[in-house]
Structure formats: structure tokens, C-alpha cells
């Protein structure tokens, strides 16, 4: 993440009237106020980054949620810690702030990362002249910090020309938000505008849309047999899975943002047994929901084309 006063950028996006208070850009009072916040921003960023909070790390994730909740509560927001909708996940934070005007704004950020336990010990937070480094510094603990300080900037300037600001800080985004899907749907329906605090493209570009993601799982059922005594009696699920993956790789390349890539594979239980079970997960990125239907139909068709006799292929859609 770039070490800049992102609070100014976000605040200007939230309410255009604040931007009008800074007609000279970086010379304006809002920019100067945001610049003064930089040390405090980086201090909070360091605190959050130096806590391991990979998705499913309940202890670390809960520590981060509590820190965020306390910071938002200190800004005068009404804060709730809500249990995740899926097991083995930390609490989500929902904070609201009432204003005196019109317009309901929803901010969404997440505190879980893709990094495993012990990552912080290996490469903790650090900075150089222009950047901050560490697990989750950009995706997306930096966004959480931006949201907190944007709200603080509005509060410090006495800006209340909005009906309500809601801030959801969730804890399972990196796995498709299984802990907040219903919550996100409810909050989005209550808002007039939603801003996602994921990092955009450099330099300082606001991203107005992103591709969606989903996953398909291919499960193959074969027949186990001893690999030395009677391999001919077996039906190798691993070989059929390889066949299905090769078929999947021939998915038509449409050129409109649809991609499908095998990301997980597993097969077998013991080294001397012909695998009875094998599975693979295909990560799909798409621009339109209908593209997922194209992939589903393609994989289901392939499931009926087996190379290894007596194996069964099941394709399931892991919606996200």
C-alpha cells in the first residue's frame, strides 16, 4: 500500500461537499487535516498487520475485530459484534453513525488475510520512504484503517449531512464471505451507496467494478484395490480426475473476462491402494452471473464422458 492520506480520498468520495472545502486540492484544509492523521494511521495499521488473522484464525481474527470495534466506538458509532454465519470464524463488526441529512452509505472492508499462522513472525510490518509492507497491509487492513480515519475526518470537521453511515468489517472475505453473505445482502439493500475498501489500481485509481468469483468441485468415485496384488480390480479415481481436468482445460476461451483454473487437487488415502476417491476445485472468475451457468453446463457434460470404466463423476457448484 502507498503511504498516502487515503482518508482524504475516501472522504471526498463519501461526500462531494467536503471536497468543495478543498478547492486547491493538496493545499486545502481537508488534505492538510488528513496529512496530520498519517502517523496515527500508520500506528493503527502496524497494530493490525502484526496480528495473524488468516481466514479461519479465530483467535487472531477476534483480536483484530475487537480493536476495530473499539476504534469505531470511540468515534461515536453504535457498534455490534455479530457472530459469523459459518463456523470457526471470528465475529464481524457492524458500526453505524447517524447524521442529520439524507443518503445512507455503506462501507465494507475485511480483516482476514490469505496468510497462515506464523507469517507475522517471519515478516512483520515495516515501512520504507514510500510504502508499508506486511501480511494484509493492502488487502485489506489498509482499507479498514482508511475507513476508520475517513469517518474520524468527517467527525472532526463536524460534517453530518448524511442520514447514516454503516461500516461492515467482515472476517471471511478471502473465502467468499461464508460468514456474512446474508448480512451483506441485508445491509446493501438498506444503503443508497456502497463503497468497498479493497485496494484499487495504482496510482490512486478508484475501481468501479470487479469480476465475481465462484468455484466448482469435481468429485470422482472409483474402486479401491491393492496396487501390488490386484491392481486390475481397481478403478483409479485419480486417473479419471486427470481426464476430467484435461477436459475442463478446454473450456471455450470467450475473451470477455471468463477464466477457470484448477487450484486444488486431492486423491487417494494410502500409497499402496488404487485411489477410490479424487477431487479437484476449479476457481472461476466472471463478469456476469450467466457465465457461471456456461461453466456448469460444460463441466456437467464432461462428467458423462469418462475414460476409466466404472468411475462416477459428480460436479457441484460452490456458490459465492
Question: What are the functions of these language-model segments?
Answer:
Residues 1-6, 162:
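Positively charged n-region of N-terminal signal peptides that target proteins for export
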Residues 7-17:
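Bacterial N-terminal signal peptides
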Residues 22-26, 43, 53-54, 63, ...:
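Metal-dependent amide/peptide-bond hydrolase catalytic core
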Residues 22-135, 153-162:
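Acidic/His- and Gly-rich active-site-bordering loop/insert found
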Residues 47, 149-156, 243-249:
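Short glycine/serine- and small hydrophobic-enriched flexible loop segments
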Residues 131-145, 226:
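Glycine/serine-rich anion-binding loops at beta->alpha junctions
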Residues 140-213:
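Acidic/histidine-rich catalytic neighborhood of metal-dependent amide-processing enzymes
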